[in-house]
């Protein structure tokens, strides 16, 4: 199937986009990557890589020209600490990116367009209990996302639906549930919970200070999906004959306290949890994968333990370099 197909991955300098480029190249696609920045941790193997600001219409026209398919991953986003404090910027920037990229794809005759949405579209009123009922795709309505990031994702889902209905572009919509793995943001405020926990545990191990800070009581729940499963699922959905939103995540829920213990077990270190005030997001969130299994005949297979075992050593190495640099004598 990939022979002769040319694809665009927007957000190709970011965590999921970078891994997706590598996955698609391994399958034989010709890939153009576009982002505001190059990948931070390893070079992209895209056939072409362009540094473009996709908030600008003319850049979106350039990025989507001469291609068959678009994987739309570009977004201004981060972990809960970031999205809870930057509502206006997120709504403004992501609205421009998605409006312009989708319309430019239509203008340039792109045949198929996959939009990466998020579990943040689900209403807050369905996620008030840590022992949350797994979220089905139809649970997004009546709409009440917790934050601007979720609202923008939901509106962009509708935009894709109407572009398919009105203009005939074949759209696909995937809702991510907490994707993690190596070569992703691990510090600076935009990192997600698994990367943040790996960083904190690594710092505890390398400095000898066992205290690990956790926002809130740590009993908020989430499910976490490893990056290799994520990019495989994205490609399977692009090839499937299905245009409604589809969850992509693990359906095993853990508390943040449990996540901390799991990372500590991988690191081989005893930690002391210190609960502090901080943004916690919704109380509970988990993916219902019933429709995913029906549509793709597949679901994520890599366990949380295995994913953490693949992720933690990479982050520990980077934390170690940072600790060493901080302890080096100044001249």
Predicted regions: what they are:
Residues 91, 95, 145-157, 187-195, ...:
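Short-chain dehydrogenase/reductase
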Residues 7-27:
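N-terminal Rossmann NAD(P)H-binding glycine-rich loop of SDR-like oxidoreductase domains
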Residues 44-57:
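Rossmann-fold cofactor-recognition segment
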Residues 23-26, 52, 203-331:
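C-terminal substrate-binding subdomain of Rossmann-fold SDR/epimerase-dehydratase oxidoreductases
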Residues 54-94, 104-107:
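NAD(P)H-binding glycine-rich loop region in Rossmannoid oxidoreductase-like domains
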Residues 144-172, 196-206:
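Active-site Tyr-X1-5-Lys
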Residues 99-146:
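Conserved Rossmann-fold NAD(P)-dependent oxidoreductase catalytic core, especially the SDR/UDP-sugar
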Residues 121-123, 172-194, 221:
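Flexible, glycine-rich beta-alpha linker
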